[in-house]
UniProtKB/Swiss-Prot annotation:
This is Myosin-10. The lineage of its organism: Eukaryota, Metazoa, Chordata, Craniata, Vertebrata. Residues 1127-1147, 1697-1728, 1872-1976 are annotated as: Disordered. Residues 1967-1976 have a biased composition (Polar residues). Keywords: Acetylation, Actin-binding, ATP-binding, Calmodulin-binding, Cell adhesion, Cell membrane, Cell projection, Cell shape, Coiled coil, Disease variant, Host cell receptor for virus entry, Membrane, Methylation, Motor protein, Myosin, Nucleotide-binding, Phosphoprotein, Receptor. Residues 85-783 form the Myosin motor domain. Changing R270C: Found in a patient with severe intellectual disease, microcephaly and feeding difficulties as well as cerebral atrophy; likely pathogenic. The keyword Chloroplast does not apply.
Length: 1976
């Protein structure tokens, strides 16, 4: 079940097509056939239909082939209705049986649905193919969904566990069990994948440097564990040979914070031998296949066939490459954080395990002793493990064993040696695996404590039932018994909770108890002992064997219900245990050996003492192993060897596993478990095949069928009321009346109508529950009902159709009758003559009517044509308007598009600004943290430097002392040598003692380890208790409100109780007085009447008191009006108080009886007592009546009085607390004030100066802000003007388009070209912005690189200094060593000094290594930044190339646009506006430059102040001679200087910020100017190109015209010459005319011929001219063909000349003709006209040329202006650079001054050290601090200079942030105003509180006085009572003096109350509630 990927639709592997399932035909078929399941050998179960019942047997017909069979009724299992086909939760099946479960799983598996729920289980069947249901899209599909909302999936289980953990704060667990190859490990990986994706910390947090590192490591832990713990078996190519429990810890927010892995039962025997066609662990094959040659030579690796432990050689895994897997394993280890040394050490151990197998022994000839003939393999093994070869060989062949108290060498046999080697190999690999798990846990544990919650994932083998099972199978089956018990118990609990929620009555059965007998059989410790306890017990006995163990087990557990003995002697099994999954036969071969796991302790000791640290770490607990020396001998019994063990030195495998399992179960019980049961479908690893018997066995073993059994005991089928009513209401048609009815009532009526047995159902609050099978029965009845309804419906439909067909036939019959009647009438009339006339005349009547209709149609057609013409006109008008509207719409759309682009650009700018701001803030935070780290590091180095200097001084003093003592010690050397010999002997004795102590120490360490493990368990228990406490706190939080109410009532009851206690004490005192009066009444019986009258008088007084109290009540009513709401609750509390009073009175009666017993002395006293009791009873009645009346009257007053006192006391306590806080704050402030008083004096002056400067700078900043805001406002106005002009221009263009039809086309073309140009310009601007951003980023990276280089240089200097110090110390150390070596043999003190020096040297070397590491880190950072810089350079080159391409494209578009003059005019207007904006920006730049100059001046001022401070520092240094006197002054000046430096730093930062702002503005202006300049250059270039093009065209035209003119001149000259010649000839002809008249006829003939030739010539001439014009036109269209066209023109001109020569020749021949002269004259006039036309054209072109020249001059003027502006900007830039150069010079000067100061300081230190060495040693720390401050100041100055240099680069960013800062400033002002208002309000509240405190104090003092009075009175009364009691005890006479002093005054709130002694103490208790009542 690897990662499922593919292109298929994942939903078909998750969701079921319900349309197929709810097919009515299938439902009807199931109902009709009564389908059931019968057993089948081949298919497990087959579907069949019941045909006939014959007693206990039933005849059935198989559904597949129709065969009939007889089956027992008990073997038949019901089939579920088709609606339950492929159900997602098998608990919903109404027929819960094995056949239905198997059928459902089979159907889903064949449909590709591998996950199915079964109640709490999720059953998974291995598909043996890739399914596309594990992608991240599927994870997102299940994320946040509940279990019932999505189909079954391992992701749904994971999501449910994760959500329950977050919501309920309860730990979760996911338990994956199943056979090997069922997919446990893959599902575990999918769970981890899902949790790592859902709970990843890389989506928002920044806890670690690498986001998502923990999740990545968590996912990479599996490949490592699989390589070392998985192997290929017959069933599974990647079988986990161990169990694991993965705990993933989460914090309170749900993010993963760590993980932990626990492993169980590694199959270590696979490392030494494997079954046929199986492999050992993957890592051996991966190492041998994937290791390189160098690694193979280091690990001494060979071929696969050269290792004995690889039993089957190399067996490849289909579809996998071990070489690739090895690389993946190594990569996973690197990701997990394994070091190279750790990986190499692990691989060495793996290679050593293989080498163990190649060690061979042979048996000696005459003895059984083993020998090693070849030790080559042993040498390789010892080389890999770091052991001595000889010692290893000796330990294997002749180990040293203990016999009694002595050790002897015992020879081993070949079998014993082979066994020892295999045991060592297995133990080595097991320890390596344990170390690997521990190392992975260490990498995954990111917290110092466990997370808030965790999800545990258990991947462990399921039940294993082989033919014969061993000790490992017992452990696995024992584990599964415990897990199944946990499941049964959990399922029982959940069912119980469900039934409780729904209010269902059910007698619950805890099915978890069913498995307890089997578990007790295995784990019970005693009475009788279980299997594991007996096994451990046998391991302790010397001669125990496996056979004795089996005998004891049978003896102890033979009668157990779950234990069986083998039935026959020939059975191979030793005993059987009946597990819940079935009976399992166990063979007890070598169980004692496996339980003890013995090793050769000699070799283990060697491994523990290995020179390889890793191997020694693996074998550190060597004392816990069971040694082979404890095995006394190998007996010949069938069960193995006997053992002799140490006492208490080891713990067996069974004990360890039982403890780990107990711990695991405790963890699981404290979690909410989720169960995943993995099923293997077949053993052939074939997809799509399912073996039913195999699946049934696994379902039985996995507990799925057990869960079904538990479900059947209850009500497994449950359905909500609405669904039940909707589905089954058809069965009870009249049970529910019409109208609305509650769902529960409706279901109850339906159940009553269905007459179901009450035991078959339960009705809950929202659902109705049914026993298994009830819903199937209802489904059958529903199907029968539906069948009846359908049959009735079909009958009705058929009747309706028959009636409809009958009506149709009736209608057809009546129609036939009509047709027959008409045909008969026609047959009668067809021969009648009149009928014939009628048939002929009738059509003629119709013709006349048609003419009239045609005329009407013509008229109608004319009307329609008129309407059509009218409509067409309107349509044309509408189309014209529509066209106009479309044009307007296009205009508006273009405007809207422009606005949208502007908005998008602004939004993009805002986003970039925000991102830039965020980036700058992050950079600032990083830099600040880096600075703090460097400062801390520098401080640490300085401290270390001081310590080293002090240490060096100490060493120098020690060396001086040792030099003096060395001579003395030389004399004592001889005696010391003798002492040394004695000491050496003592050392030997001490070493023996030390070895003993080491052993004892190891024992103690073992005990400590055990205590630590117990402590860990206790911590786990405490954590579980804390979980339970958290869960209870959730419940407590719900009850807090009720608790508060109860607390209030309890407080009120306590108040009433206290009152009643006071009253009780009063009554007790009264009783005491009365009892004291009993003896007195013997003598004073006559005076009782007077006493009674006195009591009556006191009653009168009480009434007076009552009246006074009523007055006080009326006075207090105003104060307690607001407490009237609590009156009713007070009544209730009073009733409770009265009840308590009655209880107390009963207690009082009990006390009275005790007193009576004490007083019962004589019979006379008894009689007197009875009489006195009667009298006392009467007095008591009277007193109780008075008390009741009194209480009834003053009870309300007491309560109100008490509440008022409580409020006052609360106010008093609040005032006290407030006062105490104020006093604490006052004291703290006073101490701070005292500490700061001395500093304030120094700071006030500096503060005033800095405040003045700050105000000045604030004013400058405000001016700059104002200027910036003014510039923004102007920019906005210009933008608005530009938009208005753009709109006007668009309107003009639209008018031109309407006016000129031809211009529309050109305007549209221009608009399209313009949009293209805008796009191109926007692209160019975007590229420009990107270039600027990249350049700024490059500059920033360069700055960071420079800063890092500077830091690196500083670190390098510090490192060099430290190296110098180290060298000096090393040289001193060498000298010290030489001196110490001379006296090494004599003095132990010198050895101690040597050790100290060595430690110091090691510390220094370690520090040096740390510095080297830091240097390497900086170097790596530098390289990384250099790579990033190179990448950015490449990107910049790419962007430049793109920009150049875009510029080329822009030039092409500019050439196309150059033909439109209107567009050029528009550009000219825009250019003018841009020039205006540029001038405004220039003015802004000048103002910002002035502000920059002012800031620089302020900086120079600060530098002057800094120089002054340095001068002061020099004065302080010069006055350092009087160090002792001026220390206090130096400290003051130091603090003042620090304050000044801090203030200067802040001022400098403010200046830097302002300078940054101005620099950014300047950069922004420069960028704008550059952009404008580039725009101007482009415009000028385009105009130049246009002018050059026009100039070329004009020159070409002029040349052509000149050539034509030259031709005309030639023709004119020839014509004149011919004219003259013709005139001469004319004269000759006139003279000879007479002679020529004769030949005229012939001449005329010749003339006609010549005329014909002349026409031909003229036609040829015209064609030549036409071709010449075409050539001219072609030459204008294409410049590239100019030369060829000119050649053609020349050729045509030559042809024209030849034709003209022929024409002239013809003219010469027609001399005599006048017509020829006329024709030539007319030709000349035509040529003159052509000449004049061309001259006019030339003049026009010259005018255009002059106009273009004037435009060119204007452009040149503008270009010169732009050049001047650029020159001014360059001058400003040069000025800024010169200023920066000045600041650099100033910095260098400051550095020189700093160096001079350092030099002076060093000179002063030397002088002072020479003069005052003692004083210097005391003040070195302070001087060092001053040095650090000076260095820090120099660094800060350098940093300030760097920041000044950077201001030019950062100015642009600050200028962009000005607007945000101004907005923030407004917000800060509002917050400050709110804070001021809040401060005023708090002040008022403080004043009011102080007034209330004063008032409370006054009232408190008043109450205190009253309380003191009451206390004194109470004490007086107590004294009187005590005296009376003493007298009563003595039996003396009692004088009633209390009768006269029974009253006193109690003043409260101005009211005077006279209270009797009876009420005094109760009143006192009311006044002071905290004082307990006085009672005896």
């Amino acid at each position: 079940m690897a990662q499922r990927t593919g292109l298929e639709d994942p939903e078909r592997y998750l969701f079921v097509d319900r349309a197929v399932i709810y097919n009515p035909a299938t439902q009807a078929d199931w109902t009709a056939k009564k389908l059931v399941w019968i057993p089948s050998e081949r298919h497990g179960f087959e579907a069949a239909s019941i045909k006939e019942e014959r007693g206990d047997e039933v005849m059935v017909e198989l559904a597949e082939n129709g065969k009939k069979a007889m089956v027992n009724k008990d073997d038949i299992q019901k089939m579920n209705p088709p609606k339950f086909s492929k159900v997602e939760d098998m608990a919903e099946l109404t027929c819960l049986n094995e056949a239905s479960v198997l059928h459902n799983l089979k159907d889903r598996y064949y449909s590709g649905l591998i996950y199915t729920y079964s109640g709490l289980f999720c059953v998974v069947i291995n598909p043996y193919k890739n399914l596309p249901i594990y992608s991240e899209n599927i994870i997102e599909m299940y994320r946040g969904k509940k279990r019932h909302e999505m189909p079954p999936h391992i992701y749904a289980i994971s999501e449910s566990a994760y959500r329950c953990m977050l919501q309920d704060r309860e730990d979760q667990s996911i338990l994956c069990t199943g056979e090997s190859g069922a997919g446990k490990t893959e599902n575990t990986k999918k769970v981890i994948q899902y949790l790592a994706h859902v709970a990843s910390s890389h989506k928002g947090r920044k806890d670690h440097n690498i986001p998502g590192e923990l999740e990545r490591q968590l996912l990479q832990a599996n490949p490592i564990l699989e390589s070392f713990g998985n192997a290929k078996t017959v069933k599974n190519d990647n079988s986990s040979r161990f169990g694991k429990f993965i705990r993933i810890n989460f914090d309170v927010t749900g993010y993963i914070v760590g993980a932990n892995i626990e492993t169980y039962l590694l199959e270590k025997s696979r490392a030494v031998r494997q079954a046929k066609d199986e492999r050992t662990f993957h890592i051996f094959y991966q190492l041998l296949s994937g290791a390189g040659e160098h690694l193979k030579s280091d690990l001494l690796l060979e071929g696969f066939n050269n290792y004995r432990f690889l039993s089957n050689g190399y067996i490849p895994i289909p579809g996998q490459q071990d070489k690739d897997n090895f690389q993946e394993t190594m990569e996973a280890m690197h990701i997990m954080g394994f070091s190279h040394e750790e990986i190499l050490s692990m691989l060495k151990v793996v290679s050593s395990v293989l080498q163990f197998g190649n060690i061979s022994f042979k048996k000696e000839r005459n003895t059984d002793q083993a020998s090693m003939p070849e030790n080559t393999v042993a040498q390789k093994l010892c080389h890999l493990l770091g052991m001595n070869v000889m010692e290893f060989t000796r330990a294997i062949l002749t180990p040293r064993i203990k016999v009694g108290r002595d050790y002897v060498q015992k020879a081993q046999t070949k079998e014993q040696a082979d066994f020892a080697v295999e045991a060592l190999a297995k133990a080595t690999y097991e320890r390596l695996f344990r170390w690997l798990v521990h190392r992975i846990n260490k990498a995954l544990d990111r917290t110092k404590r466990q997370g808030a919650s965790f999800i545990g994932i258990l991947d462990i083998a399921g039940f294993e039932i082989f033919e014969l099972n061993s000790f490992e199978q017992l452990c696995i089956n024992y584990t599964n018994e415990k897990l199944q018990q946990l499941f049964n118990h959990t399922m029982f609990i959940l069912e119980q909770e469900e039934y409780q929620r729904e209010g269902i009555e059910w007698n619950f059965i805890d099915f978890g108890l069913d498995l307890q007998p089997c578990i007790d059989l295995i784990e019970r410790p005693a009475n009788p002992p279980g299997v594991l306890a007996l096994l451990d017990e046998e391991c302790w006995f010397p001669k125990a064997t496996d056979k004795t163990f089996v005998e004891k087990l049978v003896q102890e557990q033979g009668s157990h219900s779950k234990f069986q003995k083998p039935r026959q002697l020939k059975d191979k099994a030793d005993f059987c245990i009946i597990h819940y999954a079935g009976k399992v036969d166990y063979k007890a071969d070598e169980w004692l050996m496996k339980n003890m796991d013995p090793l050769n302790d000699n070799v283990a000791t060697l491994l523990h003492q290995s020179s390889d640290r890793f191997v020694a770490e693996l074998w550190k607990d060597v004392d816990r192993i069971v040694g082979l020396d404890q095995v006394t001998g190998m007996t010949e019994t069938a069960f193995g060897s006997a053992y002799k063990t140490k006492k208490g030195m080891f713990r067996t495998v069974g004990q360890l596993y039982k403890e780990s399992l107990t711990k695991l179960m405790a963890t699981l019980r404290n979690t909410n478990p989720n169960f995943v049961r993995c099923i293997i479908p077949n053993h052939e690893k074939r997809a799509g095949k399912l073996d039913p018997h195999l699946v049934l066995d696994q379902l039985r073993c996995n507990g799925v069928l057990e869960g079904i059994r538990i479900c059947r005991q209850g009500f497994p089928n449950r359905i909500v009321f609405q669904e039940f009513r909707q589905r089954y209401e058809i069965l009870t048609p009249n049970a529910i009346p019409k109208g609305f009815m509650d769902g529960k009532q409706a279901c109850e009526r339906m159940i009553r109508a269905l007459e179901l047995d009450p035991n078959l159902y339960r009705i809950g609050q929202s659902k109705i529950f049914f026993r298994a099978g009830v819903l199937a029965h209802l489904e059958e009845e529903r199907d029968l009902k539906i069948t009846d309804i359908i049959i009735f419906f079909q009958a009705v439909c058929r009747g309706y159709l028959a009636r409809k067909a009958f009506a149709k036939k009736q209608q057809q019959l009546s129609a036939l009758k009509v047709l027959q009647r008409n045909c008969a009438a026609y047959l009668k009339l067809r021969h009648w003559q009149w009928w014939r006339v009628f048939t002929k005349v009738k059509p003629l009547l119709q013709v006349t009517r048609q003419e009239e209709e045609l005329q009407a149609k013509d008229e109608e057609l004319l009307k329609v044509k008129e309407k059509q013409t009218k409509v067409e006109g309107e349509l044309e008008e509408m189309e014209r308007k529509h066209q106009q509207l479309l044009e307007e719409k296009n205009i508006l759309a273009e405007q809207l598009q422009a606005e949208t682009e502007l908005f998008a650009e602004a939004e993009e700018m805002r986003a970039r600004l925000a991102a830039k701001k965020q980036e700058l803030e992050e950079i600032l935070h990083d830099l600040e943290s880096r600075v703090e780290e460097e400062e801390e590091r520098n401080q640490i180095l300085q401290n270390e430097k001081k310590k080293m200097q002090a240490h060096i001084q100490d060493l120098e003093e020690q060396l001086d002392e040792e030099e003096g003592a060395r001579q003395k010690l030389q004399l004592e050397k001889v005696t010391a040598e003798a002492k040394i010999k004695k000491m050496e002997e003592e050392i030997l004795l001490l070493e023996d003692q030390n070895s003993k102590f080491i052993k004892e120490k190891k024992l103690m360490e073992d005990r400590i380890a055990e205590c630590s493990s117990q402590l860990a368990e206790e911590e786990e228990k405490a954590k579980n208790l804390a979980k339970i406490r958290n869960k209870q706190e959730v419940m407590i939080s719900d009850l807090e409100e009720r608790l508060k109410k109860e607390e209030k009532t309890r407080q009120e009851l306590e108040k009433a109780k206290r009152k009643l206690d006071g009253e009780t004490t009063d009554l007790q005192d009264q009783i005491a007085e009365l009892q004291a009066q009993i003896d007195e009444l013997k003598l004073q019986l006559a005076k009782k009447e007077e006493e009674l009258q006195g009591a009556l008088a006191r009653g009168d007084d009480e009434t007076l008191h009552k009246n006074n109290a009523l007055k006080v009540v009326r006075e207090l009513q105003a104060q307690i009006a607001e407490l009237q709401e609590d009156f009713e609750s007070e009544k209730a509390s009073r009733n409770k108080a009265e009840k308590q009073k009655r209880d107390l009175s009963e207690e009082l009666e009990a006390l009275k009886t005790e007193l009576e017993d004490t007083l019962d002395t004589t019979a006379a006293q008894q009689e007197l007592r009875t009489k006195r009791e009667q009298e006392v009873a009467e007095l008591k009645k009277a007193l109780e009546e008075e008390t009741k009346n009194h209480e009834a009257q003053i009870q309300d007053m007491r309560q109100r009085h008490a509440t008022a006192l409580e409020e006052l006391s609360e106010q008093l306590e609040q005032a006290k607390r407030f006062k105490a806080n104020l006093e604490k704050n006052k004291q703290g402030l006073e101490t701070d004030n005292k500490e700061l008083a001395c500093e304030v004096k120094v700071l006030q002056q500096v503060k005033a100066e800095s405040e003045h400067k700050r105000k000045k700078l604030d004013a400058q900043v405000q001016e700059l802000h104002a200027k910036v805001s003014e510039g923004d406002r102007l920019r906005v106005e210009l933008a608005e003007k530009a938009s208005k002009l753009q709109n006007e221009l668009d309107n003009v263009s639209t008018l031109l388009e309407e006016a000129e039809k031809k211009g529309i086309k050109f305007a549209k073309d221009a608009a399209s070209l313009e949009s293209q140009l805008q796009d191109t310009q926007e692209l160019l601007q975007e590229e420009t912005r990107q270039k600027l951003n990249l350049s700024s980023r490059i500059r920033q990276l360069e700055e960071e690189k420079n800063s890092l280089q500077e830091q690196q240089e500083e670190e390098e200097e510090a490192r060099k200094n430290l190296e110098k110090q180290v060298l000096a110390l090393q040289s001193q150390l060498a000298d010290t060593k030489k001196k110490v070596d001379d006296d090494l043999g004599t003095i132990e003190s010198l050895e101690e000094a040597k050790k100290k020096l060595l430690k110091d040297a090691e510390a220094l070397s370690q520090r040096l290594e740390e510095k080297a590491l830091a240097y390497d880190k900086l170097e790596k950072t530098k390289n990384r930044l250099q790579q990033e810089l190179d990448d950015l350079t490449v990107d910049l080159d790419h962007q430049r190339q793109v920009a150049s391409n875009l510029e080329k494209k822009q030039k092409k578009f500019d050439q196309l646009l150059a033909e439109e003059k209107s567009i050029s005019a528009r550009y000219a207007e825009e250019r003018d506006r841009a020039e205006a904006e540029a001038r405004e920006k220039e003015t802004k730049a000048l103002s910002l430059a002035r502000a920059l100059e002012e800031a620089l001046e302020a900086k120079e001022e600060f530098e002057r102040q800094n120089k002054q401070l340095r001068a002061d520092m020099e004065d302080l240094m010069s006055s350092k001679d009087d160090v002792g006197k001026n220390v206090h002054e130096l400290e003051k000046s130091k603090r003042a200087l620090e304050q000044q430096v801090e203030e200067m730093r802040t001022q400098l930062e403010e200046l830097e910020d302002e300078l940054q702002a101005t620099e950014d503005a300047k950069l922004r202006l420069e960028v704008n100017m550059q952009a404008m300049k580039a725009q101007f250059e482009r415009d000028l270039q385009t105009r130049d190109e246009q002018n050059e093009e026009k100039k070329r065209l004009l020159i070409k035209q002029v040349r052509e015209l000149e050539a034509e003119l030259e031709d005309e001149r030639k023709q004119r000259a020839l014509a004149v010459a011919s004219k003259k010649k013709m005139e001469i000839d004319l004269k000759d002809l006139e003279a000879q005319i007479e002679a020529a008249n004769k030949a005229r006829d012939e001449v005329i003939k010749q003339l006609r011929k010549l005329q014909a030739q002349m026409k031909d010539y003229q036609r040829e001439l015209e064609e030549a001219r036409a071709s010449r014009d075409e050539i001219f036109a072609q030459s204008k269209e294409s410049e590239k063909k100019l030369k060829s066209l000119e050649a053609e023109i020349l050729q045509l001109q030559e042809e024209l000349a030849s034709s003209e020569r022929a024409r002239r020749h013809a003219e010469q021949e027609r001399d005599e003709l006048a017509d020829e002269i006329t024709n030539s004259a007319s030709g000349k006039s035509a040529l003159l006209d052509e000449k004049r036309r061309l001259e006019a054209r030339i003049a026009q072109l010259e005018e255009e040329l002059e106009e273009e020249q004037s435009n060119m001059e204007l452009l040149n003027d503008r270009f010169r202006k732009t050049t001047l502006q650029v020159d001014t900007l360059n001058a400003e830039l040069a000025a800024e650079r010169s200023a920066a150069q000045k600041s650099d010079n100033a910095r260098q000067q400051l550095e020189r001054q700093n160096k001079e100061l350092k030099a002076k300081l060093q000179e002063l230190e030397g002088a002072v050290k020479s003069k005052f060495k003692a004083t210097i040693s005391a003040l070195e720390a302070k001087i060092g601090q001053l040095e650090e401050q000076l260095e820090q100041e120099a660094k800060e100055r350098a940093a300030a200079n760097k920041l000044v240099r950077r201001t030019e680069k950062k100015l642009k960013e600050i200028f962009m942030q000005v607007e945000d800062e101004r907005r923030h400033a407004d917000q800060y002002k509002e917050q400050m105003e709110k804070a001021n208002a809040r401060m005023k309000q708090l002040k008022r509240q403080l004043e009011e509180a102080e007034e209330e405190a004063t008032r409370a104090n006054a009232s408190r003092r008043k109450l205190q006085r009253e309380l003191d009075d009451a206390t004194e009175a109470n004490e007086g009364l107590s004294r009187e009572v005590s005296t009376l009691k003493n007298r009563l005890r003595r039996g003396g006479p009692i004088s009633f003096s209390s009768s006269r002093s029974g009253r006193r005054q109690l003043h409260l709130e101005g009211a005077s109350l006279e209270l009797s002694d009876d009420d005094t103490e109760s009143k006192t208790s009311d006044v002071n509630e905290t004082q307990p009542p006085q009672s005896e």
